[in-house]
Each structure stands twice: as structure tokens, then as C-alpha cells.
Amino acid sequence: MILVDMSQIMMASIMMQMHMSKKNEPEEEMVRHMILNSLRMYRTRFLSEYGELVLCYDSRHYWRRDYFPDYKYSRRKGRESDTKDWDTIFGCLNTIKDEIKEHLPYKSVEVYGAEADDIIATLCSEYAEEIMILSGDKDFIQLQRFPNVKQYSPITKKMVNGENADVYVKEHVFRGDTSDGIPNVLSPDNTFVDGLRQRPLSKKKIAAWIDHDFDDVAPNDEVKRNYQRNLKLIDLTYTPDELSEEILDTYRSTSAGDRSKLLNYFIQKRLSNLTESIGEF
């Protein structure tokens, strides 16, 4: 199966379109074409080896934010000071998402409380068939511990590989993830929210920790607690069991869209260039 991180594909398309048009709000028709053409292109490239597309979406609500309220705080804060029309951007993306679910012949998986990361990780841990993850997100490197899992970045147009998956996730947990608002294990929860500097964490210190049980080498109880915080937020094996079960139930019960709807949809949305390649969808 080809597991598509739809949030990344869709956001990359809309940002590229707005950059090209030099406007602060998207042109829905062009964004729609770019997203659909990306799916066509990746399906054509990977179908024969990995099978059909499975479209994985972020829920509007994340379990990680319940556990750690400052999760992805910097992204929310950044949007508040941005000149882009984010209401229109998200409205456009939601419209196209609904159209894709209704009209395209692929399984779409979205589960309340789950991010696409949780969906992709759950399916990778459950199925032994050949799997291609379409995402540039390095969080997925940890899933390459499964020998049947590969990853391709639509951003760099290259395979994502060359890392030891188990070492990578350990280092990632120690360092945290600035883009997701997760401080390193030496730093408190409020580091990014309150504009504090992270406490320095050297490569030498990480190397000294990596082959040990962290409880044996952590300098104090606060750092042990921060380690558990990061482990739960970053290591995808910590997706809650009940959520993983719901993801699997949703995947198994979801039918692919009706391919016969595709032509009428393309005509309705005036996707004439894509109509010529309809057999590739």
C-alpha cells in the first residue's frame, strides 16, 4: 500500500500555489488541480510495486494536545502573526478533502484524535505487505525498522533513508522537536511558550546516554519526567492502544471511492487536463 500523508501533500500544494500567485489567499481551482495531479503522479510511479493509495488525514483534534497542551504551539502562534488568510486556506483544503473522499477511488482514513502519523504508524505495524510512505516528515524514519517499509519525500523528490531507525528515534526523543513545540529532555514544558532558551544538549551527552536505560543515566527526576514526555509525543509506538484499534477498524471498514464518479467530478470541476489522464487515477 502507498500511505499518503495528505496534510503535507495538500499544504505543500496550497503554499506553492500562493507563492506563485503572490497572493495571501489560495485559488481553489489551481490548488485542486495540483493536489489531484500529485496523487496521479505518485500513484503512477509506485502502484506496480506497492499497490493502491491510502489517504491518511490529520483529525482536527490531536490526542497529543490533550496530553501536552503546548504541542505545536509555535505553529498556531505563527499563524496568528502571519498575513496569510488562514481561514480561507483551511476552508479551501477542507472543501477539497471532502471532494476527494467522495469522488476519488481510494480509501481515506481520518480518525478523531489521530494525526496522519498515528494512522501511518498503525498500518505499518499491522501489515507485512510492501509499504511506501509518501511524506518528507522525518518522524517516519522510525517506521523503517520494519523491513517492508520505505519512505519517499514529495518535497525533496528523494527516498528518505540512510538512518538507523532505532538510533534515530532515541536521538529524536532526547533532542525534542522544535517544530512541534517539544523541548529537549533537559528543558521544561513551557520552554517555547514562554520564549525560554533550551538547556544545551551536546552530541557527546546523547552518545553517552544512547546505549543505556535512561533511568540509570538521567541526571535527575525532572529530566526523567521530560524524557517520558518526549517518548510519548515522538515515539510512534506510544499511540494509545484504543486509538490504534479505532484506526484499524476504520481502515478495514472503509471502502474505496466509486471510480465511476471520477469523470463527472472532473467535468464538473473543469479538470480537462486531468481528464486526459483519467486512467492513471
Identify the function of each model-found stretch:
Residues E49-Y50, K77-Y265, K269-F281:
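Extended two-metal-dependent nuclease catalytic cores across DNA- and RNA-processing enzymes
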Residues M1-D98:
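Domain-level signal for Mg2+-assisted phosphodiester chemistry and nucleotide/NA-binding surfaces
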